[in-house]
A protein has these predicted regions:
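Solvent-exposed interaction surfaces and binding hotspots enriched for charged
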Residues: 1-90
């Protein structure tokens, strides 16, 4: 990604995190996390269908792709957060 694309990507992610931060004042983090994961899975199912998957079809390649991407991002964020002494703001 170019610097501009990376910046736009992070800005979009920050918008989702801003919603999570707002919800965090009233709900446990675990509930917010579960809702965000469900919403992401739901949206990615829509993306897969828009790219040609039939409604109700489960494509293991698509599942593996999204799981792999999530795992990479989670590991990267865990390493970044756990190496910091500062508790991050969600």
């Amino acid at each position: 990604m170019s610097a501009a694309e990376t910046s736009a990507f992070m800005d979009r992610a920050d918008k989702f995190l801003a919603v999570a931060n707002t919800l965090a004042s009233d709900l446990p983090f675990s509930q917010i996390s579960a809702s965000m994961m469900f919403a992401t899975a739901r949206f990615n199912a829509f993306v897969a269908q828009a790219k040609g998957l039939e409604p109700g079809e489960v494509d293991e390649v698509t599942v593996a792709y999204f799981c792999g991407e999530y795992e990479k991002m989670l590991r990267e964020n865990l390493a970044q957060i756990l190496s910091s002494k500062k508790v991050p703001k969600l």
